[in-house]
């Protein structure tokens, strides 16, 4: 993903986590907050408890690629943080991962033309 489409600073992540809404899909969680910009930005969190550096980087790369492929469908004006919650994300088939990400984006209502569901957590 291009640098302009990524969250970079801890303050940006904290704002999304604090002000945004949360949707949970078991292995992956999404926090999303409006950003008043013409673009949507994404960030990715993979905790150390999910495995060593190789596993964490593999999860981060795979989730980032799934989001990159779906990015044209995402409406502008959102900041999103994807939080990996399972080491299985490193091993599941990529089409399954892509479907999981797409389902989260649709539930959050950030896909162009989608309507948001009630979040799992506030």
Curated annotation (Swiss-Prot):
GO cellular component terms, semicolon-separated: ribonuclease P complex
Keyword Hydrolase recorded: yes
UniProt-listed Enzyme Commission number(s): 3.1.26.5
Top class in the EC scheme: hydrolase
SUPFAM superfamilies documented for this protein: Ribosomal protein S5 domain 2-like
Protein's UniProt keywords contain Nuclease: yes
Catalysed transformations (reactions): Endonucleolytic cleavage of RNA, removing 5'-extranucleotides from tRNA precursor
Xref: PROSITE patterns: RIBONUCLEASE_P
Entry-linked InterPro entries: Ribosomal_Su5_D2-typ_SF, Ribsml_uS5_D2-typ_fold_subgr, RNase_P, RNase_P_CS
MF terms in GO: 3'-tRNA processing endoribonuclease activity; ribonuclease P activity; tRNA binding
BP GO annotations: tRNA 5'-leader removal
Top-rank taxon: Bacteria
Family: Belongs to the RnpA family.
HAMAP family (UniProt xref): RNase_P
NCBIfam families in the record: rnpA
Subunit structure: Consists of a catalytic RNA component (M1 or rnpB) and a protein subunit.
Protein name: Ribonuclease P protein component
Organism field: Roseiflexus castenholzii (strain DSM 13941 / HLO8)
UniProt lineage: Bacteria, Bacillati, Chloroflexota, Chloroflexia, Chloroflexales
């Amino acid at each position: 993903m291009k640098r302009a489409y990524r969250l970079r600073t801890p303050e940006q992540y904290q704002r999304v986590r604090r002000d945004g809404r949360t949707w949970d899909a078991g292995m992956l969680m999404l926090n999303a907050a409006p950003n008043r910009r013409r673009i949507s930005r994404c960030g990715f969190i993979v905790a150390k408890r999910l495995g060593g550096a190789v596993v964490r980087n593999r999860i981060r790369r795979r989730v980032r690629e799934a989001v990159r492929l779906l990015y044209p469908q995402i409406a502008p004006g959102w900041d999103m943080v994807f939080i990996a919650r399972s080491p299985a994300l490193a091993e599941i088939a990529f089409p399954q991962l892509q479907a999981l990400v797409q389902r989260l984006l649709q539930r959050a209502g950030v896909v162009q033309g989608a309507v948001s569901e009630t979040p799992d957590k506030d």
